[in-house]
Every structure is written in C-alpha cells, then in structure tokens.
Amino acid sequence: MRPLKLILQAFGPFAGREEIDFTKLGDAPLFLINGATGAGKSSILDAICYALYGETTGSERTGDQMRCDYAAPESLTEVIFEFELAGARYQITRQPDQEIPKKRGEGMTKKSHSATLVALKSDGNELIANKPNPVAKAVVELMGLDVKQFRQVMVLPQGKFRELLTANSKEREQIFGQLFQTQLYSQIERALFERAAGIRKEKEEFDQQIKGTLSVVGLESEEQLQTELTELAPVLTHAQSQLKAEQQQWDETKAHYQAALELEQQFIRKQQLVVEIATHQEQATHIEMLRQQRQQAQKAARLTAVHQQWHQAQKNLQQAKLKVEQQQTLLQQAKAQQQQAQQASQQASLACEEVPKLNEQRITWQRAEQKLLAQENVQQAVAKAERELQLATQNALNLQQASEKLEQELQNQRLEWEQQQRQLTRLEVQKARMNQLVQQVQAREREQSLLNELQTAQQALLRFEQQHHHIQTQAEQAKLTADKLEFAWHTQRAAELALALTQNEPCPVCGSLEHPNKAQYSGDVVTKVQVEQARQQQQDWVQRQQEAFHAWQQQGFKTEQIAQNLTTLSSELTLQQVALLNELIEQQQILHSDIAALQQLNPDLLKRQIEEGEQRLAHTKMTLEKQNQNQQQAWQTLAQLQAELASLRQEIPPELSDLDTLRSAIGRVQNQIEILQKAEHTAREQWVQAQKQFASVQAAYQAAIEAHRESQRQQEETTSAWQQGLLHSGFSDESAYLAARLTDEAIVNIERQIAQYEERSAMLSGEQQALSRKLAEKNRPELEPLLVKVTQAEEKMALALQAFTQHQSRMDGLQRVAKQLADLYQKNRALEAEYQVVGTLSDIANGKTGAKVSLHRFVLGVLLDDVLLQASQRLMKMSRGRYLLKRKEERAKGNVGSGLDLMVEDSYSGKWRDVATLSGGESFMAALSLALGLSDVVQAYSGGIRLDTLFIDEGFGSLDPESLDLAIQTLIDLQQGGRTIGIISHVTELKEQIGLRLDVLATRMGSTLRLIT
C-alpha cells in the first residue's frame, strides 16, 4: 500500500480542511512529520488508520471522539484517503457519527457513520462498497491485514512499538499467516483435526451401537449371547417336534368331525326337501292360468298388424278431409289478394306521370345552389383575408412593441452588468472579513464554553470541599470512638489483672508487694475484635479523607487552570477589541447575507444574456420587416375577393338567395320523386307475387282432393281385413282383442315364470331321489362328542405353537444380534486402522506432540528465521554489533503453543535473553529492525501483500546520537529500496537530516499543515 493523498476536515486538532499530497514528496520518499507536542502529528496516522478500518492507531479514541472542537458547526468531520495497491488506485471516504445543524429550524441532529470505497479507473470510478461494515471487509480483503495487524507491521504507533517485538506465538502466528498467506497449512491442520475427531466420534458411536444391540435382547456381553444360543438350540428342536405331533393329532380329529358334520347336513337337507316340494306344488294352479294367458296373447299378436293398419287408415282419412277444407280457405284468400294488388299497381302508375315535371324543377334549383356555394366560398375567402389582414396588422404592432421592449431590456442589462462588475470587487474583501468573524465567533464561543466550564468546575469544587469536610468530621468521630474503645479495653484488662493480685505477692506490672488501690472497671465488656474493627473503620475514614482531599485538590487545580485559560483568552479578545458574541453573530449573519447575495451575482451569465438579447432584437426587426410586407399583400388579396363577391350577388335571383331554404326545397322534390318511383315498383312486384301465390294455392287444393279420395279407398280396404281377422281368431269384438293383447316383455315374463317352475320341479325331485338312495343304509351321527375332541386337540396345538414361536423368536433375535455385532466389529477394526494414521498426523500437525509446534507454526518458523536474518543485520548495525534476534526454540511450559517467540543475543555477555528485557531505546531499534526485515521478506516472497509503506510514531527520542544516526541511515537504505517511510518525531536532529518534511502548526483555532519539499 502506497499513500497518494490524505484530506482531513474537522478531524483531530484540524479545524478546517487540510490536504496532504504524498505524490509531491516523490517516489518512495523518506519524510518527517514534525510539530510541537499536541499539535496533531499522530492524528495523521489516526486519520489513515481510521479511513481504512474505522479505528485509530491507538484504539483509545473512537471516530466520534475525533471531531475538532474548533470546527464550524456546519463543517463535517471527514477523512478522504487515496492510495495505490498492486498498481490499482483506490479512494476511501469516511465520516464518523457526529452532530450537524438541522436543515430547517434550529438545533442539531445526529448524522450516522458512513463510509465509501471506490476504485479509481481511467474509464470511470467503480463503487466497491458504500457502508461501514462492507467497506471494512473490503479493506481487509484488499490489504490482507486487519486493523491490529496493520498497526503492528505498517504503523508503529506512539508507545506501541514494543507490541510487534513482544507479541506471543499466537499473535505472531496470526500476523505472519496473513502476511505470507499460509492459510493452507492451517486448513490442513484443521482438516486433519476434524477428520480425526470424526473418526473418534464414529468409533464411539460404534461402541454405543454394540451396547445398544446387546441391550435389545436384554444381554450385557457377547459371552451371554453365545451361551444362550447354545442352550436354546435343543430346546427349539424339541418344541418343533412337539408342535408337529400336536398338529397331526388336530388334523385327524378335525377330519373325523368334518365327515360327521357333512352327513348330518345331508339328513337335514332330506327333511327340507319334503317341505320345499309341497310348497312348490302349491303354485301349479297359478302356472296353468299363466299358460292360458300366454295362449290368448299369442292369438292377439297375430292380429296386431291388421289392427294397426285399420286404425291408421281411419286417421289418414280424417287428416285428408281437414286438408281439403284448409286449402279451400287459402284459395279464396289468395284470389282476393290478387285483385287488391292489381288495383294498387294501376293507381301507382297513374301517380308516376308527375315525375318528369318534378325532375325539371329539381335541376333548376340545383344550378342556383351551385352559384350560392360559389358565393359562400368567396365570402369565406373574404373573411379569411380580413382576419389575415387583421393578424398581420396586430403582428406588426406586437413586433414593433417587442423590439422597443428588447431595446429597453438590453439597456437595463448593460447597466446591471456594469453594476455587478463593480460589486464583485467587494466579494473577496467580504470573504476575508467572514473568515475573521468566524475565528472571532469561535473564540467568543470558546470563552463562553470556558466560562460555563468554570462555573461547573466551581460548583464541583464546592461539592468536593463539602464532601471533604463531611468525611473529615466522620474520620475524627471514628478516631474518638476507636480511642474510647481502646481505653475501655485497657481499663478492662487492668481490672482483670487487679482481680488476680494477691497480698504480699509482686505485681506483674510494677513489682509492688502491696496493692492498696486496685483498678476497677464498671462499663460494658469490650473485646479485642471490637477495638480492631473500630481502628479499621478509623483507617477506612482516613483513607476516604485522603481520597476526598486529593479529589478536592485536583478539582482546585482544574478550576484554577480553567480560570487561567479564561483570563488569558478574555485578555486576548479584549486586546484585539473583539466584539461581544451576540454582536459578532449579528455581524456574521449580515455579512453572510451580503456574501450570499454577491455569490448569486453572475456577470458572465448576464453578458451571455445581453448577447442573446441583441441577437433576438436583430431577429425581431427582420421579422417586423417581413410582417409589413405580408400586411400589404393581405390588403391586395382582400380587394380582389370583395370585387368577385359583388359580381356573384348580381347573378342570383333574390328569391333563391337563401342556400338552406333552396337545399330544403331540392331535398323535398327529390324525396317526392323517389317515393313515387318506389311505390310504383313495389305495387307491381306485389301484383306479380299475388298471381304466383294464387296459382300455387289452386294446385295444392286439387292435390288435397285427390289425397282425400285415396284415403277413403284405403279405409274401406283395412276395415274389411280387420273384420275378417276378428272372425277367424275367435275374438268377439275389438274389446276382447285389446283385453287379450300383451306386450312382448309381459309375454317373456310369463314364459320365464313357467320355465322356472318346471326347472325347480325337476331339480327338487331329482335331489330328493338322490339323497334317498345315498342315505338308505346310513344312521344319523352324534356331533357333540366329536366337537369336544376337536377343541381339546386345537388347544394342545395352540400351546405347542406358542412355545415354539417364543423359542424361535428368541433364536431369531439372538442370531440377528450376532450378525450385527460381527458387522460392527469389522467396521470398528477399519476405523481403528484409519485412526492410527489420521490421528497421528492430526496430533503432529496440530502441535500436540514433541515440541508443541504445529505445522502452520513450523512453516511460519522457517519464514520467521528469514525475517530475523534480515532484521538482525539492521539491528547489528543500529546496536553497533551488540544484538542479534533469534527464534526461541525451547518448548513453552504446559500446553501453551510455542515456536514463534523471540529472543535476543547480547554479544557483550554472550548470552541469550528475552526481548522483553531490552531497554526503551533498544526495544525501539529491535522493533524497527523487525518491521523492516518483515517488509523485505514479505515482498521477496510476493505473497500478494506488499509492505511498501512504514510509519513510525516516536521512539527516536530514546536513542543516543550515534544510534539515531545509524537508525536514520537504515531507513535511508530502506527508502532507496523503494519504500515510503514516514517518521513522526520532534527530535531536532531528524529535522536537520531529513529534507522532506510535513510540519504540523498548532494555533489557538486549530492546527494546520504545511508541506516542505
């Protein structure tokens, strides 16, 4: 990553908009970021880190805490960082959470954190991400480093340079893994571990399956399974033999019972046949009646055709007679219609004799109509010409007025353009005045803020003072209480000793043999614990008193500092004769309105408008001249049309001068002609049609008479045939015939009943004779004893079957379990063999054996050796041959992973020791060497991550002059190799030796930047 441009606005100590163009420093520059303490040198690194990751280099402050207190309310806190990575250019813009003025009304509103990442291309920018989280992920993917790793390898923040040096193996593994892209080895470790864990899990599942399989049959071990299988085999064989014997006995008993049951059913059937035959013979009379009914129906069936013909002939004769009567009526109607149509046709022909006279009148009126139409066209042309003349006159007048108006507008615009030119000379003066007012307002607001802080601090100081006095009183009270308890305890102890004194024996305290005035105690009993608790409470109150006094004292210092700052600022403002805040704001508003009004001025636009107006004026004058010509032409056209109209009016008679009346008369005549002609044509057609209708009806009448004669003849013939049929069939009349006649279905039904009766008679008789012959020499059996034997045999067989089924089911379950166990043991042996290989590889790859070094750390250890080789060369140079960096090879204690920890060799003592034992300056040189070595090796391996840039924040102040020169020379060598190196320091020697410099200048209204090349 190579920085190209950094823009800061209202960020950190920078109140305004500051821009750093790194390209002006040249390719791979070595430059110094210089400035006083607190000016904002580290804020530049914070801005780069915050733009990329949304976090500052030290992580002590969040984005919303980076807003400059001196920034104008409407100025957004924003960082824009443009950088180059792998030949591609990117720009990232980030704005933290912040309060901004409302667009409408007063007050502030919260603006949420926003971020945008764009790829800068020659053919247009490409948006990569436009929200904080997606931007952070995209930056990690592009850089190959997260924020913590970025701070450790590309930025050595102030006070953080030891972290890269003293990081443990786990932290260094994460950094190197990202830099060298060795995730493949971690994936191998994880894959082996997961595969081994999966095999272990499968093996445990198989063990559980074995236990579960045995538990299904209620056993706990395979020995029990084999024992039961051996013991159950003969028992199952005996049960099977017993079942076969009982089943054979049941079959024989059941066969005997079945034969006796069939014989009993035959005897019962013989008795039933006697009853059924008697019942069947009762239907003989009904069957005979059906036979006679069938015979009569068969006779009637032979007369059916003759009877139908006779009835049809009578029906046809009646229809023919009715037809003759209908046709006779129609013939009379047709003759009357023919006569009426003939009279109507003659009358229509007489009326049509008026048509020629009407046609002549119509033609005369149509000629007059043509002249009136011509006159109307000329009148319309005259009206149009008058309108065109009026329009031309009005247009000429409008153009004349527009021309005069344009000339006046142009004159006004020229005057306004000259006035704007004069006013614009005041804009820069007003802007400068506005900047001065903004600074003065900010200063007055700072003064007001300090005044508020002072009031708040004074109130807090009063609270701290009151709190201190209260706690001091409590501490004094606790001391009095503890003193009283301790005195009472000593008095109590003296009284206890006095009780033990004996006359003429020495006192253990004073040695006297006489004890005239023994100590006495009459108060409450006091224990040593109570005294100690009271003293502890006293100490607690004393501690709280000290803390309260310290807080009071600190608040006093803070209040004094605020008062001093307020006094200094107020004095400066008074010295500069700065107006009061409300006056400044009023002036600012007036000036803002004036500047806004001046910024609205646009003399260039007005100049273009003047030029366009001049072009419009010339065009308007040209159009006016053409319009005058059109007006003259319109006068001539109107005069010609008026003369033509007067001539046409003289040719038309007065009585035909109205066009609508004339057209109405023509229409009436034309309509009358059409009505007469149509009436004649219609009457003639109706007469012809009536003649045709009369002839047709007359022919139909003759045909109806002939059909009636034929129907009468057929009726006579069928009547004779019907009378002969009745005579030969034996029926007395038509009623007797109809009574005997049956439908085909009825006859079929009678024949079916007769056939069924005869078939059943034969069947019952045959079955009775067969049973009589079969049972002639047999006795009727007794079924009850046989049924008892069958039931007993069936019960014995069921018991034998139940016993066999139980034994067989148990045997099947045991054999199934035995087979499942065999399959499980075979699979388990395969898993054990696989785990011997995979498990061993997993333990080795994950660092669970030997030196506790995983495969990933082993690979990184080799890479770290290369890094340390490069780093040691620089460290040897900077430490004047004293120190070398080396990887710690001893195994860490316990289960902690190792393999990437660092040690340093001290050539003065000849011993190796931990890098944490280095001094501040030595640690800085070692960390710098390690960072530079890491940069060399990463770029040499070309793993997709390029460490083209290194920022170092402080640390040079801990070096002596000679070490400082060596460190600078090392950085110069690195810079000549194509690296961009930025150093943040206030060390004077660096300022003298490094020509490229970015100065951070601190002012009362915020810091500014100045690039010196």
From Swiss-Prot:
This is Nuclease SbcCD subunit C. GO terms for biological process: DNA recombination; DNA repair; DNA replication; double-strand break repair. Residues 242-262, 281-486, 604-717, 739-838 form a coiled coil. Keywords: ATP-binding, Coiled coil, DNA recombination, DNA replication, Endonuclease, Exonuclease, Hydrolase, Nuclease, Nucleotide-binding. Belongs to the SMC family. SbcC subfamily. The keyword Hydrolase applies. GO terms for molecular function: ATP binding; ATP hydrolysis activity; DNA exonuclease activity; endonuclease activity. ATP binds at residues 35-42. GO terms for cellular component: DNA repair complex. SUPFAM superfamilies: P-loop containing nucleoside triphosphate hydrolases. Heterodimer of SbcC and SbcD. Pfam families: AAA_23, SbcC_Walker_B. SbcCD cleaves DNA hairpin structures. These structures can inhibit DNA replication and are intermediates in certain DNA recombination reactions. The complex acts as a 3'->5' double strand exonuclease that can open hairpins. It also has a 5' single-strand endonuclease activity.
